Amino acid sequence: MVLQTQVFISLLLWISGAYGDIVMTQSPDSLAVSLGERATINCKSSQSVLYSSNNKNYLAWYQQKPGQPPKLLIYWASTRESGVPDRFSGSGSGTDFTLTISSLQAEDVAVYYCQQYYSTP
């Protein structure tokens, strides 16, 4: 029997200021992945979060486990926070981004959020 691990994906909306609302949409809503297999979570921004002056994408990924605050995994779309296992990786640019867990572990069961920080209230 294949052990299935449910990875719950959620949606984070970040309301911007002068640039107009930037809406972040994640897919899929939930994902069933076997332990040891790859999990892929997509995030789409309603407008580009790539800042042309420094060529950086203002996009972060967070992991939240029950009863705990969100933990930063990835910033600048693809830079892993210190201490985050290398099975977590981020990719994408402009409006389309992906978080990949290359080999899902039991401790990875959580809610995952993408967040733009290109514009803030």
Curated annotation (Swiss-Prot):
InterPro entries: Ig-like_dom (IPR007110), Ig-like_dom_sf (IPR036179), Ig-like_fold (IPR013783), Ig_sub (IPR003599), Ig_V-set (IPR013106), IgV_Light_Chain (IPR050150). The gene is IGKV4-1. The keyword Oxidoreductase does not apply. Residues 21-43 are annotated as: Framework-1. Immunoglobulins are composed of two identical heavy chains and two identical light chains; disulfide-linked. GO terms for cellular component: blood microparticle; extracellular region; immunoglobulin complex; plasma membrane. Its main location: secreted. Transmembrane segments: none annotated. Keywords: Adaptive immunity, Cell membrane, Disulfide bond, Immunity, Immunoglobulin, Immunoglobulin domain, Membrane, Secreted, Signal. This is Immunoglobulin kappa variable 4-1. Residues 1-20 form the signal peptide. It is found in: Secreted; Cell membrane. Residues 21-121 form the Ig-like domain. Residues 44-60 are annotated as: Complementarity-determining-1. Residues 61-75 are annotated as: Framework-2. Residues 83-114 are annotated as: Framework-3. Residues 115-121 are annotated as: Complementarity-determining-3. It comes from Homo sapiens. Residues 76-82 are annotated as: Complementarity-determining-2. One of its GO terms (molecular function) is antigen binding. Disulfide bonds join C43-C114. V segment of the variable domain of immunoglobulins light chain that participates in the antigen recognition. Immunoglobulins, also known as antibodies, are membrane-bound or secreted glycoproteins produced by B lymphocytes. In the recognition phase of humoral immunity, the membrane-bound immunoglobulins serve as receptors which, upon binding of a specific antigen, trigger the clonal expansion and differentiation of B lymphocytes into immunoglobulins-secreting plasma cells. GO terms for biological process: adaptive immune response; immune response.
